[in-house]
Amino acid sequence: LELNLRIKPKKRLYREKPEPLSVPSTINEVWSMDFMHDQLMDGRSFRTFNVIDDFNREGLGIEVDFSLPAPRVIRALDRIIEWRGWPLAIRCDNGPEYISTLLATWAENKGITLQFIQPGKPQQNAYVERYNRTVRYDWLNQYLFETIEDVQGAATAWLWTYNNERPNMAIGGITPMQKLATVMPVAA
């Protein structure tokens, strides 16, 4: 049966060619953020929102909930900014939370550049993708969680261990906090 109907082309979000992934030279130069998904024991899906500083690969925060819309992302970023300061740029993929006008307006008001990777090219956000793999293998796949509170508690405990005790080979076999100490003045 040939109906000769026109095939409607998909709308594509075209972005200019991104810059190659550079190694930041100081803290708060570029942050990366991404989402991960998993399930509780009862089968309900939850999401984790991960934010790292690309300079020392420090995990700045892991937010866990069943739904993490753009206002929740902004609230999590504001909490991180309170103690860490503003980044110059944040690298992220093209998820609906990231391309929302709410997040774009927030970033513009704070003077933060949102760097979007090309669709289907997660290697352009390699720092946080590698971090996600570590999150997945070090604790997310190791336990079965009954509640969101259990997941958030485990995430907070693991984040401290990751930043303070776990050596990172990408930054010379030292922990993210040791890398941070090499550039931050020590209070006397």
Segments predicted by a language model, with ranges:
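Charged DNA-binding/catalytic regions of mobile-element recombinases
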Residues: 1-188
